[in-house]
Amino acid sequence: MSRFTEKMYRNARTVTTGMVTGEPHEPVRHTWGEVHERARRIAGGLAAAGIGHGDAVGVLAGFPVEIAPTAQGVWMRGASLTMLHQPTPRTDLAVWAEDTMNVIGMIELKAVIISEPFLVATPVLEEKGILVLKVADLLAADPIDPVETGEDDLALMQLTSGSTGSPKAVQITHRNIHSNAEAMFVGAKYDVEKDVMVSWLPCFHDMGMVGFLTIPMYFGAELVKVTPMDFLRDTLLWAKLIDKYKGTMTAAPNFAYALLAKRLRRQAKPGDFDLSTLRFALSGAEPVEPADVEDFLDAGKPFGLRPEAILPAYGMAETTLAVSFSPCGEGLVVDEVDADLLAALRRAVPATKGNTKRLASLGPLLNDLEARVVDENGEVMPARGVGVIELRGEPVTPGYITMGGFVPAQDEYGWYDTGDLGYITEEGNIVVCGRVKDVIIMAGRNIYPTDIERAAGRVEGVRPGCAVAVRLDAGHSRETFAVAVESNAWQDPAEVRRIEHQVAHEVVSEVDVRPRNVVVLGPGSIPKTPSGKLRRANSVSLVTQ
């Protein structure tokens, strides 16, 4: 039995901890033992349907109460799990079905397990000849024991957030999960007896599926889990649950903390909830903006939020989940560097005066990983030299499944090219500057889109998190860029002119270069991934029409 499954099953039989779901209307607590018994039934149903060792299964379910036993049931059969992209009420089901069929064919899924709120997709999938298994039917089966699993068996195939038309899935093995889970346990100073995890993160994203479902199930940790829709309906539910359950650990992308800060200021008053129990509030999955972190800490202070609770981190699906954590209890550490030297010489030189740039330190590497930074010739850079971050170690995926077949993620020496530009400090802390493919090169300077987007976001009338910088003329001797922003006033010509002018002004103030053009769009126009990241490459048409 793999170390991952052996420990998960053992903890299910021995711990009294569990998972609370159904908040805020019908909270129910399920012990991990109860989840395990449901998983044995689901495994029985899967066996009856012919699912066995080495098979791949897709899952289309919205509620953690069903996703947890379904995932464990799939692993009991020695099969791998893929959380499929979920249709929304606005999704064209015919287009979604075509994209989903691409994924099903690519991964060679043997079946799709389905439940609410996606049962409406059942006939669409069955028409395409897909074996559809309903969670309710699987739960009615007789329970069976798990089959043997090996360290290099596939556990997860995590769809990346690229184009749905040309999908790609990251292969995650039992060995990968065990290694990264144990490393995070150490990095988070986890205490199974005391810690309570609170999360609304989606299970179709690695941070929600691995960090806040698989790992608590593996360690037998106390978990309170709601859905992203619950969070979007009531952002303050997040704070309410931390208060109600004395939550000690949570995680989210930068934008979610910025949103919570706004809601705390506008809709809550001191005494409404107590956030003082929170010791580990991880910020990851997108660039960590020091100003947003500081704003969140300021907004949370009247509610007992401690500044040392915030934990900037670095991670990706290709390393199972996590690469580095800031040290517990240290809070936000800002690396302030000379912005001109960073742009022109690719060197992160500490500075406190003049034109400086503030970057969040993302902490030292977790166990079982090593990192290096290389230049365009593959030469290893010294400390504070800016280049491409490469990673090696046990949590790193063997590779991807693509429409063209398997593509290895590691070179012959085991190094994985992250595509992230950054540097490592003298103390061994990782700092990320941006994505290689998004950086705009003008007159030999590296201009990072996040700087442009942050400047545009300062303009009154621009919706939070809804500004995108788009690289134009990539590869030409002089690249340029344009900016698209969303505003509720997009149909008011006078407001549009004001926003265009002010965005251009703020961008010039920030990066000393004027955008080729600024476009003001209505809400929902800028494409984003399911986890809320900007799709910069998909935004070109917004600024070139």
Swiss-Prot record:
GO CC aspect terms: plasma membrane
Keywords for the protein's UniProt record, in alphabetical order: Isopeptide bond, Ligase, Ubl conjugation
Protein name listed in UniProt: Putative ligase MSMEG_5435/MSMEI_5285
Class of enzymatic activity (EC top level): ligase
PROSITE patterns found in the cross-reference section: AMP_BINDING
Signal peptide range in chain numbering: none
Database matches in SUPFAM superfamilies: Acetyl-CoA synthetase-like
GO terms under biological process: fatty acid biosynthetic process
Top-level division of the source organism's lineage: Bacteria
InterPro entries: AMP-bd_C_sf (IPR045851), AMP-binding_CS (IPR020845), AMP-dep_synth/lig_dom (IPR000873), ANL_N_sf (IPR042099), FAAL/FAAC (IPR040097)
EC number(s) on file: 6.2.1.-
